[in-house]
Amino acid sequence: MSYLGVGVSPGNVPVYHGMNLKVIDRRVRLAELVLRCVICALGVLAAVLVGTDTQVKEIFSIQKKARFTDMKALVFLVVANGIAAAYSLVQGVRCVVGMVKGSVLFSKPLAWVIFSGDQMMAYLTLSAVAAAVQSASFAKLGQPDLQWMKICNMYGKFCNQVGEGIASALLVSVSMVVLSCISSFSLFRLYGGNKGKDGARW
């Protein structure tokens, strides 16, 4: 008996057919490859936008230059997105090689490594975006209680470019969360397949 391409054993344990498993794996890998390419491109874009952002302003005959290194949260954002882009590039190459060879991922240790790496990257990018958004809000709105000025009133171009970089980084973090869900599916379906085989034996 089958339902939606999934076989059901006498013990009512779903068992994926071999051919359907390959089709599912191909679609999952294609989605994974697209997301990794998006993360790589947007990660580089976010790092470049924030890392190259500068603006010089003359205040009381003194020139002051705003750069991303003035805010530690922006430095963290640049580093985190650079790491995420490099990681996604490596994993993207792995996806391409796997798709060319037509192999199906059955290695549990490798699946665990990919799952753990994606989880770490998701947490890293999310924390970087959260820290950058908080710092950017202080720069935009100021903090009257602490007598912090609205920096963006003086460095408008700098703040606008930082905002674009944070928006790109936000898309990276969201894509990374989706990708971690895909890698968790790829991992735990291996255990589901084993359970199905055990159920079929009974």
UniProtKB/Swiss-Prot annotation:
GO cellular component: plasma membrane
Cellular localisation: Cell membrane
Cytoplasmic compartment segments: 1-29, 94-118, 186-202
Transmembrane portions of the chain: 30-50, 73-93, 119-139, 165-185
Top-level taxon: Eukaryota
Extracellular side stretches: 51-72, 140-164
Pfam families with a match to the protein in the record: CASP_dom
Membrane topology, record value: Multi-pass membrane protein
Family: Belongs to the Casparian strip membrane proteins (CASP) family.
Subunit record text: Homodimer and heterodimers.
Name the record gives this protein: CASP-like protein 2B2
